[in-house]
Amino acid sequence: DEFDLENILDLFIDPTDGLIGPFDFANVIVKGKMGSGKTMYLRANYAYYLHTLVPCLLEHDSIILPVYIKLSDFQHLKDPKEIYDSILVKIIEEILAVCDHLKSAEEMTRLHKGAITLTGNWSTDNALIKIGNRLKELSADEYVEKIANSCETKGGIVNHFFEVCANYNKSKSIEIKSHRTPEFSDVVYAMRELITPFNGKLLILFDEIGSINKLFFKNDENGDSYFEILMNQLRTISNIRTKLAVYPNTSSDILKETRYGDVVALECDAINHPELYSSYSIKIISLIEKYISKAIEEACSSEEIFDISTQNQLLIEQLINASSGNMRRLVHLLDSSMNQAYKRNNGNGKIILDDIIDALKKQGADMENLYQSDDVDFLINISKFCKTRSTYRFSYPNKGTTISKFTNNSEEYNIIEIGQYGTGRKGTIYYFDYAYCIYKDLPTHYIKNSEKIDKTRSHITGDPIRRVAQLTDGLMAQSMVPGKIDGEITFLVADKSAGFIKGNDDREYFFSNKNIIKDDVKRAYYVKHKVRFLPSFFTDNEKKEISIATEIEVL
């Protein structure tokens, strides 16, 4: 939202793969959590088609008119019909607003700057490439003069376009806004009067859909919601396409059929899907280079700023893991890591892995500081429990309400995330945020084909931990017992009723199955099984010290 339109395409990273392009004239549903880049995607489309609109008019080529609508403008409305009517009016208003936008000489200069840079980079349309090449031959002043002449010349194509818009605005538009309830036929009429004479098409970009009242997405008595009615009406017009920004698994995420458009997913869970890492990391490196190059106004490679190479990108991988596919958070962490590097050496040298780790620890601490001391104690106890189980995932039956305060804070500051919602007798599986794992030294990866902790946390040397620690109030109480140590079973009698444990203090401890805590008494255990216990020491009649393991947790 903070970027000017002429800068959007310089900073835009194409999230699509394969034959699908980000600026195809097609129906698209853009899905992603808050901060994943949905608005950037739609604004880039708006900038792209706005930059090419007047050049296409000048060359008598078919035009595509972009209309960008933020539905948050209607979040104060409650009645679904009123929301529907307001959107119809907004579509027509925005078509006319584009016309006014194009009349400004200053705006034409900015659009010229955008137009001469975008065509070679983004367009696969031969006509647009030719137009772009001709534009590059003109200076900004010459471009504005050419458009001004076309605007002032009677019969000029741009003049004709502006006249049509002005005449429509004087008659039909004012009538709709002032005197009667709008109908979808008004949009059809506006298309026929304003765009069809120029062999034109309309691209409607709907942003912030999730901000409007949920009733807009609920089915009425006839079976369809007003949202579905609107989308079906737009879908049936051959020269209209829509691109929508939707939060997944919310009330607005109801368009499941492909007739409403292909889905562009703006999330990437690179930890749990390492096969996505390679293509995603290329996009991240491109983002780094685009943002820095734009800021310093000269080309800059990521290797000039970060201590990375083609063979070693562990530094970037840590940022990718911590961002969880959230672009806004990624940029924040990039900024924070650069700040850590600057504080470390006053701007000399590159950003190194230690700077990234410090930035992630700071992020984890900042997240924790959002909570009261009792909540922090609860978090610390769960994290300690998970650490003894060599995981960062857990389930905690009947604690959903308590845990929800850590999962519902925001998309960027949730210390705990939901990995899998509980169904039936299966409980919900939670996991700690990656930055918080770094802050609390929680393990996230095993070394490949083993259960040894991979401290590098890399997909090259390790696999993400899938183990889920099963928490109960009893186990939570045990995790807070002072003096407990870790150990490993070294010997069991035939019926497994007793045996010996070697503690991490290198002492041998006798144990009986009666010493196992109630929550774990039914769990299987075997030689080399990891346990946690409270060491107890007794002196027998011969004054020999006997070491016994009590309060045993089977890990």
List where the protein language model places each region.
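OB-fold/S1-family single-stranded nucleic acid-binding modules
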Residues: 536-555
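The catalytic "switch" region of P-loop NTPases
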Residues: 181-312
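A short, basic N-terminal segment
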Residues: 1-28, 52-57
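Conserved AAA+ ATPase small/helical "lid" subdomain
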Residues: 105, 109, 285-350
